[in-house]
Structures are given as C-alpha cells and as structure tokens.
Regions:
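Membrane-interface extramembranous regions
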Residues: 1-133
Length: 133
C-alpha cells in the first residue's frame, strides 16, 4: 500500500464513497435526475444519481488500490479521464435542464482536481524503470 498510485487511489476512492453516501443521506427528494440538487457542505450540489456515481467510482478506486500497483495505476488513469470528462461536461450543463447530475461550479472543481491527481498518478507514477543494456 506504500506506492503513490495505491495510496492516492484509496484516499480519493474513500473520499468519493463518503461524498456519495452523504449525498444519498441528505437528498432532498427532488428526483433522481433532477437538475437542482441538495447542497452538501454549503457548496457541493448534487442529486442521488451523482451520489451513486461517486460511490461506484470511489469503490472501483478503492478496490483497485487494494489490488496490484499496475491495476491501481490503470484504474486511476481511467477514472481520472472519466472525472475530467465529467468536469468538462459540467461546464456546459450548469444552470440548464440537461444537468441530470445537478453539478455546480464547486462540483466541477472537485472533479477537475480529482482528475488531475488521478491522471498524474496513473500515467506518471510507479512506472517500471527502462531496461538498460
């Protein structure tokens, strides 16, 4: 568990699971895909669909972190790319009826930040040294 990929995957994964569970517990009942959700910590907005997405992504990161370093790096990069796409989509969805995950600017910042860390870890850390002859 002492490799950066495994540690970062576990920490971010557990954080996403906690956020997802809190979103489900504090859901206002506005609707699963409602464009307006409940505020979490006074800043993060989201609905039950975003809560479940965070739980699934977080669980995948945590399970990969408990596996091998190579698998953790691959999953970190893949989920980092998904979070980057979610952040980019969120830029266009905020304030529209198409915002089925009820993301706001703070959610987008969270997704971009997690994506940057996961992509950097998954693509740049824990790589084997090149063979020398």
């Amino acid at each position: 568990m002492r490799t950066p990929n495994r540690l970062l995957g576990l920490v971010i994964g557990l954080g996403l699971v906690v956020l997802g569970v809190l979103r489900l517990l504090l859901d206002s009942g506005a609707g699963f895909f409602a464009p307006r959700g409940t505020l979490l910590f006074g800043a993060l907005e989201g609905n039950a669909a975003l809560g479940i997405l965070h739980i699934l992504l977080g669980a995948a990161l945590a399970m990969a972190a408990l596996s091998s370093v190579r698998y953790a790096a691959t999953v970190n990069a893949a989920i980092g790319a998904l979070l980057l796409l979610l952040g980019l989509a969120g830029l266009f969805l905020v304030g529209t009826d198409a915002n089925v995950l009820a993301v706001n600017v703070a959610d987008n910042a969270l997704h971009f930040g997690a994506a940057a860390v996961l992509l950097a870890a998954g693509l740049g850390l824990d790589r084997p040294e090149p063979a020398t002859s």
